[in-house]
């Protein structure tokens, strides 16, 4: 195709070339060749479709210059008359001079505009496909947790919605999200994150305004909020795997329980009706006692107690939100049976515990299972009534509470004290307990404790296949050591083991922390 165009140009301009050579100027011939080459390039661009056909120029209507012939095919039928001898040099010189700058201007500008449009379109496409990364900070790590959602459900939905990659900060880092994607997608994701953070801030602010000094205020009239303090090591035990235990307690008691965070005090906040709140507290205490083998000691740790000596903390609660009770139970789940066994035990209904005002023993050492332990050590176990008032003195109007021992001791305790050593080592039962305990006979194995005679009933049921204590080989097995759980001892021997300087189980040699009575 280019060869045909060149041949056509040469045929149209052949005669004019001869006339042009008449002037004998090599410079004019060079200009004509450059003009033809430029026109050839423009014709090729037109054939390729990258430009429009060039428009005819204004100077091509005149006397047939060599530059105007390709754009105007009718030029050859108008031959110029032979000029005079002096005029020919001026005409060819002026015609190329006037027509030389015109042909490249208009077609070249059109092709340049077309090429510029193509370049700009490619540049815009390149810019649109490029990714950018932007940091989106939020106020606190709590906002991060709220935006991410449970198991990342919210942040995954945001990634899919905005078609971006969002890197969430890990624990210990600054609360800053890294968003990567197209510029408009990144802007959309940024707006979504900031909106979610502001929404969470508003919710927390409204909650703090309506809340009490310690925690959330009741949502409905008649509801109360209490705080139950537990040891640090059992917070995870109460919460359970993936919160299963605390959810079960909430469902069973119809309450709302806020679990403590890692950087705060181990205090559970329970909100609900007064009766439901009390039941939830009981469930938490029972769960701790069953799983650890230890009873949750209050020791004024629980802000719910009305008798707390910490007036500063207690005064922060309004009287309207405090549940008033006649007395505090050491462990509320033990109310169902009077002998302190957890769950349903085969105990006669006659074993009804007296009121706390009738108990003569001290409730140290965990405050419940072993009365008298810690002050006077073995005195209560050997029948000596303590003169110190009980821990819950003044709460005689409390509900009947289960206790393990009464102030009256069994005859076997007295005989064991007599065999233990001379009267000078401890207070003698004959001299300090009164004459009514001096001549008590020794209790044979299997005989029920006489200490429960004041409570009524016929005595404990004898366990099947009664085993003897592996220490004294006289009394039946009625106690077990914690934490090993070996139930091979009578209660007296188990208590003696725990009273040693280095208490350990005779079977497994594990340190014993306490002894508990067992029932079959």
UniProtKB/Swiss-Prot annotation:
It is found in: Cytoplasm; Nucleus; Cytoplasm, P-body. A zinc finger (RING-type) spans 469-509. Residues 60-69 have a biased composition (Gly residues). Keywords: Cytoplasm, Metal-binding, Nucleus, Phosphoprotein, Repeat, RNA-binding, Zinc, Zinc-finger. One of its GO terms (cellular component) is nucleus. SUPFAM superfamilies: Eukaryotic type KH-domain (KH-domain type I), RING/U-box. Residues 49-111, 412-461 are annotated as: Disordered. One of its GO terms (molecular function) is RNA binding. Highest levels found in fetal brain and testis. Detected also in thymus, salivary gland and uterus. It comes from the Eukaryota. The modification Phosphoserine is found at residues 338, 462. Pfam families: KH_1 (PF00013), zf-C3HC4_3 (PF13920). Residues 73-91 have a biased composition (Pro residues). Residues 132-193, 223-284 form the KH domain. Phosphorylated. PROSITE patterns: KH_TYPE_1, ZF_RING_2. Binds RNA through its KH domains. RNA binding protein, may be involved in post-transcriptional regulatory mechanisms. PANTHER family: RING FINGER AND KH DOMAIN CONTAINING PROTEIN 1 (PTHR23285), RNA-BINDING PROTEIN MEX3A (PTHR23285:SF2). This is RNA-binding protein MEX3A. The gene is MEX3A.
């Amino acid at each position: 195709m280019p060869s045909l165009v060149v041949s056509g140009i040469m045929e149209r301009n052949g005669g004019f070339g001869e006339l042009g050579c008449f002037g004998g100027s090599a410079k004019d011939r060079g200009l004509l060749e450059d003009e033809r080459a430029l026109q050839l390039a423009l014709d090729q661009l037109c054939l390729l479709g990258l430009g429009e056909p060039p428009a005819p120029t204004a100077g091509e209507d005149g006397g047939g210059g060599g530059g105007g012939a390709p754009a105007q095919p009718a030029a050859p039928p108008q031959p110029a008359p032979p000029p005079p001898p002096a005029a020919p040099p001026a005409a060819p010189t002026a015609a190329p001079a006037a027509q030389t700058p015109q042909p490249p201007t208009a077609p070249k500008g059109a092709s340049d505009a077309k090429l510029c449009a193509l370049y700009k379109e490619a540049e815009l496409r390149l810019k649109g496909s490029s990714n950018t990364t932007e940091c989106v900070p939020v106020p606190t790590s709590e906002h991060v947790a709220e935006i991410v959602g449970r198991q990342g459900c919210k942040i995954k939905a945001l990634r899919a919605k905005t078609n971006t990659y969002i890197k969430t900060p890990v624990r210990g880092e600054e609360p800053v999200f890294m968003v990567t994607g197209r510029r408009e997608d990144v802007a959309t994701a940024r707006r979504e994150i900031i909106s979610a953070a502001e929404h969470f801030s508003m919710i927390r602010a409204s909650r703090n305004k309506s809340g009490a000094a310690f925690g959330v205020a009741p949502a409905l009239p008649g509801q109360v909020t209490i705080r139950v303090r537990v040891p640090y090591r059992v917070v995870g035990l109460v919460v359970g795997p993936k919160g299963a235990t605390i959810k079960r307690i909430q469902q069973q008691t119809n309450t709302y329980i806020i679990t403590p965070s890692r950087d705060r005090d181990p205090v559970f906040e329970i909100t609900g009706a007064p009766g439901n709140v009390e039941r939830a507290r009981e469930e938490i205490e029972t769960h701790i006692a069953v799983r650890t083998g230890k009873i949750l000691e209050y020791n004024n740790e629980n802000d719910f107690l009305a008798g707390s000596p910490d007036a500063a903390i207690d005064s922060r609660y309004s009287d309207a939100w405090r549940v008033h009770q006649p007395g505090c139970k050491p462990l509320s789940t033990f109310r169902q049976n009077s002998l302190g066994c957890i769950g349903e035990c085969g105990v006669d209904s006659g074993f009804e515990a007296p009121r706390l005002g009738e108990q003569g023993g001290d409730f140290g050492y965990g405050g419940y299972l072993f009365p008298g332990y810690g002050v006077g050590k073995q005195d209560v176990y050997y029948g000596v009534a303590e003169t110190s008032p009980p821990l819950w003195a003044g709460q005689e109007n409390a509900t009947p509470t289960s206790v393990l021992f009464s102030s009256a001791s069994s005859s076997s305790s007295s005989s064991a004290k007599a065999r233990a050593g001379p009267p000078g080592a401890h207070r003698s039962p004959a001299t300090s307990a009164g004459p009514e305990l001096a001549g008590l006979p020794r209790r044979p194995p299997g005989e029920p404790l006489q200490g429960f005679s004041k409570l009524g009933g016929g005595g404990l049921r004898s366990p099947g296949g009664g085993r003897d204590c592996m220490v004294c080989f006289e009394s039946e097995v009625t106690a077990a050591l914690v934490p090993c759980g070996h139930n091979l001892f009578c209660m007296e021997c188990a208590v003696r083991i725990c009273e040693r300087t280095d208490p350990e189980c005779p079977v497994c040699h594990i340190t014993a922390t306490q002894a508990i009575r067992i029932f079959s």
